[in-house]
Amino acid sequence: NYVHPFNGFSNVKTVISETREITVFIDYFYTNEEIKAINEKVDEIYEKNITSNMSDEDKIKTIHDYIINNTKYDVERNNDGKSPYHSYTAYGPLLEGYATCNGYTDAMALFLIKMGISNFKVAMTPENNQDIDGHVWNAVKLNNEWYHLDLTWDDPVSSDGKDYLQHKYFLITTQELKEIDDGEVPVLEHQFK
């Protein structure tokens, strides 16, 4: 795994004293209390839903479906940045039931790590398109191949407000992602080892 979700941070500040001593202050996304609660919830969900005879793909699908079926997209945070939920972290979907793309991605990454499956977060920031916000999703190594896994887009907000589950972005290749998104979203152009 490339970067563990719990190592994510929002701010880094360095201070140099008169004696040239450097102090670094890091604002992490997760507190120790949140990490403990998240780990307990991951263990609980895993034990209730995953069996030893499942294939890796079945395990991923089970967790994918569990997270989506128990999470609502946090429209408030996406619209104006204000929300009472920790939806941008794994805490949101796992303990509060709300997520933005970062929350879905971090939650899924924690389960993939528990399964021993290599993964990393793919971040897309459009260069010239002001109509699209940045987006993140998981890249997953399965059977020596890399696939895209996007729980956010598999948990769409329907116009009638109803929740539903889809698998359109479940373990798809880069070529499949390009075809689905009509080349609008930058995707992985090289192979990862």
Region spans (language model):
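Short, well-ordered strand-loop elements centered on a beta-strand within folded domains, enriched
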Residues: 89-91, 96-98, 145-151
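Hydrophobic/aromatic-rich core segments of domains that either
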Residues: 103-177
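Catalytic cysteine-centered active-site loop
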Residues: 83, 87-91, 98, 119-131
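Leloir-type glycosyltransferase catalytic cores
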Residues: 171-193
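Secondary-structure boundary elements
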Residues: 28-93
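Linear, non-domain "peripheral" regions
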Residues: 1-44
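Short acidic-aromatic active-site loops that bind/stabilize oxyanions
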Residues: 53, 98, 102
